[in-house]
Amino acid sequence: MIQMQSILEVADNSGAKKVMCIKVLGGSHHMVAKLGDVIVISVKEAIPGGKVKKGDVYKGVIVRTKTGVVRPDGSTIKFDKNALVLLNKQDEPIGTRVFGPVTRELRAKKYVRIMSLAEEVL
């Protein structure tokens, strides 16, 4: 579960390495974000020459969480780190590649483009 002030890794090649959650989108009572939710982030660490700069504010969709997700068959998928993919104003991925695995639950949230860019879909 991701809340305000949580630090996440970036799973795409947009140039950002670490980001901090500054707002969870989805209503006034939405305090934590889960897999597939959209959050507003601030870039805390970026590589030189990347598409994004330190201090920039973007939206991002969460693709991996430590708490994981429970599937209807009862199985649970958890990851070692929290990660997200940065989105532009039109809710399209900024990067052209997604590193690491993503889950099938993103398809239900209408993020098929992220699934097609990912190395592996679990």
From Swiss-Prot:
Superkingdom of source: Bacteria
UniProt keyword list: Ribonucleoprotein, Ribosomal protein, RNA-binding, rRNA-binding
Taxonomy of the source species: Bacteria, Pseudomonadati, Pseudomonadota, Alphaproteobacteria, Rickettsiales
SUPFAM superfamilies for this protein: Ribosomal protein L14
The keyword Chaperone appears for this protein: no
Biological process terms in GO annotation: translation
Name under which the protein is recorded: Large ribosomal subunit protein uL14
Example of a GO MF term: large ribosomal subunit rRNA binding
Family: Belongs to the universal ribosomal protein uL14 family.
Subunit structure: Part of the 50S ribosomal subunit. Forms a cluster with proteins L3 and L19. In the 70S ribosome, L14 and L19 interact and together make contacts with the 16S rRNA in bridges B5 and B8.
Alphabetical list of InterPro entries matching this protein: Ribosomal_uL14, Ribosomal_uL14_bac-type, Ribosomal_uL14_CS, Ribosomal_uL14_sf
Function in brief: Binds to 23S rRNA. Forms part of two intersubunit bridges in the 70S ribosome.
Gene symbol of the encoding locus: rplN
GO cellular component: cytosolic large ribosomal subunit
